Amino acid sequence: MADLKSIVAEKLPLTMGETIALAKEYGVRVVDVVLTESELRTGLDREGVLKAVMEEYAHNLKAVEIGVSGGNSFLLGTVPTQLKEMGPGTIFSDVLLDKALMYTVAAEVGNHCIGVRPCAGTGDPCPYTGFLRALMDVGTDETTLAEVACLMLKVGSLFRVAKVTTGCNLEGYGAGSAAIAAATVHLKNGTPA
């Protein structure tokens, strides 16, 4: 059997179905296939990919902090600050879920305050960032955080391609939901089998 990297190189770019099929065939995690594809497309090694991905989130993580620290949005007011004051576990009775909600809305509010970057106002980076920030709060290690970020971006990028080719806005919470579902499966050690 050919090595994974050479097979991925032949098929670039990979669909999600191809990504899952290769993970199953080679007995690796889906994120390992995503990272292999990223290494080939960027020329970076795995650590370089993980570092670069987290650097892309720096702006939105700053937006989250503004959003939960009194940021005020023309659309959402001060909802994240109010959620923070209520404390985790009060909306869904689940700390991680409450934090993910709070930080997702905080990313939106913060971006309304400081300007939207790198997204074009489509909303998909806000759920990704909210979920990552919640994972940070519950003590998820840096490597796992970066792997989750890569996986969410892979799923989200497929929605962006669909938007470009169909003209339909498939991003926003649609991409966010699918990306976070994939990330949750990864975090729970789910497999393609």
Across the structure, where does each feature detected by a protein language model lie?
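N-terminal core-entry segment
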Residues: 2-177, 188-193
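N-terminal Rossmann-like FAD-binding beta1-loop-alpha1 element of flavoenzymes
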Residues: 183
